[in-house]
Amino acid sequence: MHLPRLPFSACLLAALIGCNAAAAEPPATTNAAPATDSLRTITADLRTEAGPMNRMHDFCVGAGRANEGLRADWQRQLRFVREQCGFRYIRFHGLFCDDMGVYQEDRQGQPVYNWQYIDELFDFIHGIGMKPFVELGFMPGWMASGSQTIFWWRGNVTPPKDYAKWEAFVATFVRHVTERYGSDEVKTWYFEVWNEPNLDGFWMGNPEKKSYEEWSPGARAEYFKLYAASARGVKSVDAAYRVGGPATAGEAWIEATLAFCTEQKAPLDFVTTHSYATMSGYLDETGTAGTVISPDRNAITSGVKNVRGKIERSPYAGAELHYTEWSASYTPADPIHDSYHSAAFILDKMKNIGTAATSMSYWTFTDIFEESGPRMTPFHGGFGLLNYQDLPKPSFYAYQFLNRLGDTELKSSDAASFVCRNDAGGVQALFWDFTITHPGPSVINQVFYAQDQPAKPAQTAELALSGVKKGNYRLVVTKVGYQTNDVQSAWRAMGSPAQLTKAQVATLRQACSGEPVLDEKVRIGTDGRFTRRFPMRENDVYFVELIPAQKK
């Protein structure tokens, strides 16, 4: 029993319309908004701050499983997204799976621990300036009470046959990382108990094929037993270490977890859960499910705020809330992940969630992801910000642009924008059009987003800044949208080859290079004003920078 689910792109440089305050009427453009549309104006005054820029978007990012993190290509890609997108933590499954070699027992049944693979992985993560958001799971085979597994790599999802051994195992692991990295470092980590225990695929299995209503109470009680033992194991090493959960799919069991920890006095330092913007479903173990994106513009956003409300009404008011998985879709075979639509989708959620969540960990940074085994094509709807060949998808640029925003956010008149400044005197404006173009349940994502989807015109955007310091600047404009830094469309245009030659990879890399569509000099006068218009299409994203000229 699983919860219900549905059955089964060369860069184009867009014309920019320039109109500094003293300029003449802007020239016409074939990409202008229809005459019936009003002008969309984005105004900000550099003297009017909104406050520090909220960096919850770069707090954490996800990956498939720990063993994949031992690969050179995985490590190369993580180093790149760390540098470009600023991610600070990384979370993945399978830390305790048998392919990590962490646990055996001798002939007397005594534990034999081995942390060599984990050391290799954590040393790399630590060495590039990141930290692990540790998911405690799955169950080592020697400790498992059953044989139920999940995914191609066979993660055991059964409870421990001896909870005392599990607790000692967790404590020994935490003690080991403390000795290796120091308690001050480990105090900055997070220990999350298990993954999506409200789904039978991830917890206990369901050999009797019970309905969810019949299965869930027993599974939840067993998870709370695992949670309490895990928390004791973590806290036995250092009471200041952070432990949390329930890491559920679909924001389930939040109130029950808060109540359990209150009543049983079990430690709960943070709350975790997951959300995907599909109409139904939570798990696609084989990568064959059909999905439909929710037509609700507030999908994910409203759920995050609802969970925050539950926490604030509990004894844990003010607790950190981490969404340790989120994306447009829960399946690793959904072309929306490769599509230009994803960039605006991500930015809309980051803007509107605001401070309701401490972090939103995008699932995932890479297509090197083998839950349903290795995939057979370079673009297959994988979760990643990067594909196998290190090619950035539009979703990657959403996070890169967010990372390039200055630390001081300015008040903006436009709800689909961030305007910031940095300590160097530069200004950054990030704005987008978010339009759900999917027609609804009549067609699944796997059909709709696999097809060419030209973007229709949207309102022309006018960026109007005031309070800009007089002087010379570079105006640098980077764009993502249909056929602009849109590698899926470029791949489709070359015939969607299943295997890429080196020449084809080079062509695609040029198509998603992230090079500016405009880089020119501008002069800001004594009035401190800057105005420029930008033609918009559905789901276009613009990143605009005013960079003070270097004085000679």
Give the predicted meaning of each segment:
Residues 142, 191-209, 250-252, 321-331:
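Active-site-proximal loop/short-helix segments
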Residues 7-18:
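Bacterial N-terminal signal peptides
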Residues 1-5:
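N-terminal secretory signal peptides that target proteins for export/translocation
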Residues 98-102, 141-150, 198-204, 278-285, ...:
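Short acidic/His/Gly/Ser-rich catalytic and metal-binding motifs that mark active-site loops
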Residues 281-292, 307-343, 372-386:
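Active-site clefts of carbohydrate-active enzymes
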